[in-house]
Protein backbone atom coordinates (compact mmCIF):
# COMPACT_ATOMS: atom_id res chain seq x y z
CA UNK A 1 0.00 0.00 0.00
CA UNK A 2 1.27 3.46 -0.92
CA UNK A 3 1.88 5.63 2.15
CA UNK A 4 1.06 9.10 0.92
CA UNK A 5 -0.21 12.44 2.16
CA UNK A 6 0.58 16.13 1.93
CA UNK A 7 1.60 19.07 4.05
CA UNK A 8 -1.54 20.13 5.94
CA UNK A 9 -2.48 23.24 7.87
CA UNK A 10 -2.90 22.95 11.65
CA UNK A 11 -5.68 25.56 11.62
CA UNK A 12 -8.26 22.92 12.59
CA UNK A 13 -6.15 21.40 15.35
CA UNK A 14 -4.38 18.07 15.57
CA UNK A 15 -7.52 15.96 15.19
CA UNK A 16 -8.24 18.03 12.09
CA UNK A 17 -4.99 16.82 10.53
CA UNK A 18 -6.11 13.21 10.79
CA UNK A 19 -9.65 13.91 9.62
CA UNK A 20 -8.38 15.81 6.58
CA UNK A 21 -6.04 12.97 5.68
CA UNK A 22 -8.93 10.48 5.81
CA UNK A 23 -11.11 12.77 3.73
CA UNK A 24 -8.61 12.88 0.85
CA UNK A 25 -7.54 9.23 0.93
CA UNK A 26 -4.19 9.81 2.64
CA UNK A 27 -2.61 7.66 5.35
CA UNK A 28 0.11 10.06 6.45
CA UNK A 29 0.63 13.82 6.44
CA UNK A 30 3.10 16.57 7.28
CA UNK A 31 2.60 19.69 9.37
CA UNK A 32 4.62 22.54 10.82
CA UNK A 33 5.33 22.23 14.53
CA UNK A 34 4.90 26.01 14.87
CA UNK A 35 4.61 29.15 12.77
CA UNK A 36 7.03 28.39 9.90
CA UNK A 37 8.11 32.02 9.46
CA UNK A 38 7.98 33.30 13.02
CA UNK A 39 8.56 30.40 15.36
CA UNK A 40 5.63 30.88 17.73
CA UNK A 41 3.85 27.69 18.82
CA UNK A 42 0.32 27.06 20.05
CA UNK A 43 -0.12 25.18 23.31
CA UNK A 44 -0.76 21.47 22.79
CA UNK A 45 -4.31 20.35 23.59
CA UNK A 46 -3.77 16.89 25.05
CA UNK A 47 -7.32 15.72 24.29
CA UNK A 48 -6.97 16.94 20.70
CA UNK A 49 -3.68 15.02 20.38
CA UNK A 50 -5.29 11.86 21.76
CA UNK A 51 -8.07 12.11 19.17
CA UNK A 52 -5.47 12.35 16.40
CA UNK A 53 -3.58 9.34 17.73
CA UNK A 54 -6.84 7.35 17.82
CA UNK A 55 -7.53 8.20 14.15
CA UNK A 56 -4.01 7.22 13.17
CA UNK A 57 -4.12 3.92 15.05
CA UNK A 58 -7.58 2.89 13.84
CA UNK A 59 -6.72 3.67 10.22
CA UNK A 60 -3.20 2.19 10.14
CA UNK A 61 -1.44 5.44 9.33
CA UNK A 62 2.20 5.42 8.35
CA UNK A 63 4.49 7.64 10.47
CA UNK A 64 3.64 11.34 10.14
CA UNK A 65 6.28 13.95 9.35
CA UNK A 66 6.50 17.09 11.46
CA UNK A 67 8.44 19.95 9.87
CA UNK A 68 10.59 22.41 11.80
CA UNK A 69 10.08 26.13 11.08
CA UNK A 70 12.07 27.84 8.33
CA UNK A 71 13.38 30.36 10.88
CA UNK A 72 15.53 27.63 12.42
CA UNK A 73 19.15 28.06 11.28
CA UNK A 74 21.41 25.80 13.34
CA UNK A 75 24.57 26.98 11.57
CA UNK A 76 23.99 30.73 11.63
CA UNK A 77 27.01 32.95 12.23
CA UNK A 78 24.98 34.55 15.04
CA UNK A 79 25.32 32.55 18.31
CA UNK A 80 21.97 33.91 19.45
CA UNK A 81 20.20 32.50 16.40
CA UNK A 82 21.91 29.15 16.89
CA UNK A 83 20.71 29.03 20.49
CA UNK A 84 17.21 30.02 19.34
CA UNK A 85 17.24 27.13 16.86
CA UNK A 86 18.38 24.69 19.53
CA UNK A 87 15.73 25.73 22.03
CA UNK A 88 12.99 25.54 19.38
CA UNK A 89 14.05 22.01 18.49
CA UNK A 90 14.15 20.92 22.13
CA UNK A 91 10.65 22.34 22.64
CA UNK A 92 9.39 20.64 19.48
CA UNK A 93 10.60 17.27 20.74
CA UNK A 94 8.58 17.78 23.93
CA UNK A 95 5.50 18.73 21.91
CA UNK A 96 5.84 15.76 19.55
CA UNK A 97 5.70 13.31 22.45
CA UNK A 98 1.93 13.86 22.24
CA UNK A 99 2.09 12.19 18.79
CA UNK A 100 4.28 9.13 19.48
CA UNK A 101 6.67 7.74 16.87
CA UNK A 102 6.58 10.85 14.71
CA UNK A 103 9.30 11.84 12.28
CA UNK A 104 10.67 15.39 12.62
CA UNK A 105 12.52 16.86 9.68
CA UNK A 106 14.52 20.07 9.56
CA UNK A 107 16.63 22.03 7.12
CA UNK A 108 20.27 21.75 8.21
CA UNK A 109 20.79 25.46 7.70
CA UNK A 110 22.77 28.08 5.81
CA UNK A 111 26.36 28.83 6.77
CA UNK A 112 25.95 32.54 5.82
CA UNK A 113 29.48 32.94 4.52
CA UNK A 114 31.34 30.91 7.13
CA UNK A 115 31.94 28.04 4.70
CA UNK A 116 30.33 24.61 4.40
CA UNK A 117 32.75 22.92 6.80
CA UNK A 118 31.96 25.40 9.56
CA UNK A 119 28.23 25.10 8.86
CA UNK A 120 28.36 21.31 9.00
CA UNK A 121 30.27 21.45 12.27
CA UNK A 122 27.80 23.89 13.85
CA UNK A 123 24.72 21.91 12.80
CA UNK A 124 26.21 18.65 14.05
CA UNK A 125 26.99 20.37 17.36
CA UNK A 126 23.39 21.51 17.73
CA UNK A 127 22.06 18.01 17.04
CA UNK A 128 24.38 16.59 19.70
CA UNK A 129 23.41 19.26 22.23
CA UNK A 130 19.68 18.78 21.58
CA UNK A 131 19.90 15.07 22.34
CA UNK A 132 21.92 15.70 25.50
CA UNK A 133 18.81 17.53 26.72
CA UNK A 134 16.17 15.32 25.08
CA UNK A 135 16.98 12.12 26.95
CA UNK A 136 14.07 9.91 25.91
CA UNK A 137 11.93 10.41 22.84
CA UNK A 138 9.94 8.31 20.41
CA UNK A 139 10.49 10.95 17.71
CA UNK A 140 13.19 10.48 15.10
CA UNK A 141 15.06 13.55 13.82
CA UNK A 142 15.50 13.72 10.04
CA UNK A 143 17.99 15.88 8.16
CA UNK A 144 16.43 17.05 4.90
CA UNK A 145 18.42 16.92 1.66
CA UNK A 146 18.76 20.44 0.27
CA UNK A 147 18.98 22.02 -3.20
CA UNK A 148 22.10 24.08 -2.49
CA UNK A 149 20.42 27.48 -2.74
CA UNK A 150 22.64 30.26 -1.43
CA UNK A 151 24.83 28.97 1.39
CA UNK A 152 22.67 25.97 2.31
CA UNK A 153 24.45 22.93 3.68
CA UNK A 154 23.20 19.41 3.06
CA UNK A 155 23.32 20.01 -0.70
CA UNK A 156 25.06 16.70 -1.39
CA UNK A 157 24.75 13.23 0.08
CA UNK A 158 28.33 13.64 1.30
CA UNK A 159 27.45 16.76 3.29
CA UNK A 160 24.43 15.08 4.88
CA UNK A 161 26.62 12.14 5.83
CA UNK A 162 29.22 14.49 7.32
CA UNK A 163 26.56 16.07 9.55
CA UNK A 164 25.42 12.64 10.74
CA UNK A 165 28.94 11.37 11.37
CA UNK A 166 30.07 14.49 13.25
CA UNK A 167 26.92 14.51 15.39
CA UNK A 168 27.54 10.87 16.31
CA UNK A 169 31.18 11.61 17.14
CA UNK A 170 30.10 14.41 19.48
CA UNK A 171 27.20 12.59 21.12
CA UNK A 172 28.09 8.91 20.90
CA UNK A 173 27.04 5.88 18.88
CA UNK A 174 23.57 5.74 20.48
CA UNK A 175 22.64 8.78 18.37
CA UNK A 176 22.37 6.48 15.35
CA UNK A 177 18.96 5.22 16.44
CA UNK A 178 17.61 8.76 16.82
CA UNK A 179 18.78 10.35 13.57
CA UNK A 180 17.91 9.81 9.92
CA UNK A 181 17.28 11.51 6.57
CA UNK A 182 14.31 12.90 4.64
CA UNK A 183 14.95 12.96 0.88
CA UNK A 184 13.29 15.70 -1.17
CA UNK A 185 13.00 14.85 -4.87
CA UNK A 186 12.89 18.49 -5.98
CA UNK A 187 15.89 19.36 -3.83
CA UNK A 188 18.12 16.55 -5.04
CA UNK A 189 17.15 17.21 -8.67
CA UNK A 190 17.92 20.91 -8.25
CA UNK A 191 21.09 19.82 -6.47
CA UNK A 192 22.28 17.89 -9.54
CA UNK A 193 21.14 14.30 -8.93
CA UNK A 194 19.60 13.05 -12.19
CA UNK A 195 16.73 10.89 -11.00
CA UNK A 196 15.06 11.13 -14.42
CA UNK A 197 17.83 9.41 -16.40
CA UNK A 198 19.43 7.45 -13.58
CA UNK A 199 17.04 6.83 -10.68
CA UNK A 200 18.62 3.50 -9.74
CA UNK A 201 22.08 5.06 -9.84
CA UNK A 202 21.06 7.92 -7.53
CA UNK A 203 19.46 5.47 -5.09
CA UNK A 204 22.62 3.35 -5.15
CA UNK A 205 24.74 6.45 -4.52
CA UNK A 206 22.55 7.41 -1.56
CA UNK A 207 22.88 3.88 -0.19
CA UNK A 208 26.66 3.86 -0.63
CA UNK A 209 27.20 7.25 1.03
CA UNK A 210 24.43 7.56 3.65
CA UNK A 211 22.78 4.12 3.72
CA UNK A 212 19.16 3.41 2.80
CA UNK A 213 18.62 2.15 6.34
CA UNK A 214 18.88 5.82 7.38
CA UNK A 215 16.15 7.03 4.98
CA UNK A 216 12.80 7.44 6.73
CA UNK A 217 10.67 9.74 4.55
CA UNK A 218 10.44 11.30 1.09
CA UNK A 219 9.14 14.72 0.11
CA UNK A 220 7.66 13.98 -3.30
CA UNK A 221 7.84 17.12 -5.42
CA UNK A 222 8.30 18.02 -9.06
CA UNK A 223 10.65 20.91 -9.88
CA UNK A 224 10.20 24.14 -11.83
CA UNK A 225 13.92 24.10 -12.55
CA UNK A 226 16.30 22.19 -14.82
CA UNK A 227 18.74 19.69 -13.34
CA UNK A 228 21.37 21.29 -11.10
CA UNK A 229 19.74 24.74 -10.92
CA UNK A 230 20.23 24.98 -7.10
CA UNK A 231 17.03 27.04 -6.78
CA UNK A 232 14.47 24.90 -4.85
CA UNK A 233 11.17 25.76 -6.54
CA UNK A 234 8.59 23.01 -6.18
CA UNK A 235 6.14 22.21 -8.97
CA UNK A 236 2.95 20.16 -9.21
CA UNK A 237 3.42 16.47 -9.94
CA UNK A 238 3.91 15.96 -13.68
CA UNK A 239 4.12 19.69 -14.46
CA UNK A 240 7.85 20.17 -13.92
CA UNK A 241 11.24 19.01 -15.14
CA UNK A 242 11.17 15.72 -13.19
CA UNK A 243 7.80 14.57 -14.51
CA UNK A 244 5.09 12.15 -13.44
CA UNK A 245 6.76 9.01 -14.79
CA UNK A 246 9.88 9.43 -12.66
CA UNK A 247 8.00 10.41 -9.51
CA UNK A 248 5.66 7.44 -9.95
CA UNK A 249 8.73 5.21 -10.27
CA UNK A 250 10.06 6.66 -7.01
CA UNK A 251 6.89 5.61 -5.18
CA UNK A 252 7.06 2.10 -6.63
CA UNK A 253 10.79 1.51 -6.27
CA UNK A 254 11.33 -1.63 -4.18
CA UNK A 255 13.89 0.15 -1.99
CA UNK A 256 11.63 3.14 -1.31
CA UNK A 257 8.01 2.02 -1.64
CA UNK A 258 7.34 1.41 2.07
CA UNK A 259 8.35 4.91 3.16
CA UNK A 260 5.90 7.75 3.84
CA UNK A 261 5.67 10.07 0.81
CA UNK A 262 4.75 13.69 1.50
CA UNK A 263 3.54 16.03 -1.25
CA UNK A 264 4.72 19.64 -0.88
CA UNK A 265 3.54 20.80 -4.29
CA UNK A 266 1.99 24.27 -4.90
CA UNK A 267 -1.62 23.10 -4.60
CA UNK A 268 -4.94 23.66 -2.91
CA UNK A 269 -6.65 20.61 -1.40
CA UNK A 270 -8.34 19.68 -4.69
CA UNK A 271 -4.94 19.52 -6.37
CA UNK A 272 -3.55 17.25 -3.67
CA UNK A 273 -6.56 14.95 -3.99
CA UNK A 274 -5.90 14.65 -7.72
CA UNK A 275 -2.18 13.97 -7.19
CA UNK A 276 -2.90 11.27 -4.61
CA UNK A 277 -5.35 9.61 -7.01
CA UNK A 278 -2.79 9.75 -9.85
CA UNK A 279 -0.05 8.24 -7.73
CA UNK A 280 -2.27 5.50 -6.31
CA UNK A 281 -3.22 4.15 -9.77
Where are these regions (language model features)?
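Conserved, mostly hydrophobic/aromatic
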Residues: 21, 67, 85, 96, ...
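Acidic/histidine-rich catalytic cores of soluble enzymes
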Residues: 29, 130-237
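Charged helix-capping and loop-helix junction motifs
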Residues: 45-50, 82, 86-89, 120-124, ...
Amino acid sequence: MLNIGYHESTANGLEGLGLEALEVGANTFAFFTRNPRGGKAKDIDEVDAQKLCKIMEENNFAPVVAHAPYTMNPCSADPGLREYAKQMMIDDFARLEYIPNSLYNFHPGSHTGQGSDVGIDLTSTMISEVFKTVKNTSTKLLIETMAGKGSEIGRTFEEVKQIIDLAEQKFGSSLKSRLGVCLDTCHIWDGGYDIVSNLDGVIEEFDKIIGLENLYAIHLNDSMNPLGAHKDRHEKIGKGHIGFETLYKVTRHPKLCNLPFILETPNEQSGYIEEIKMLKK
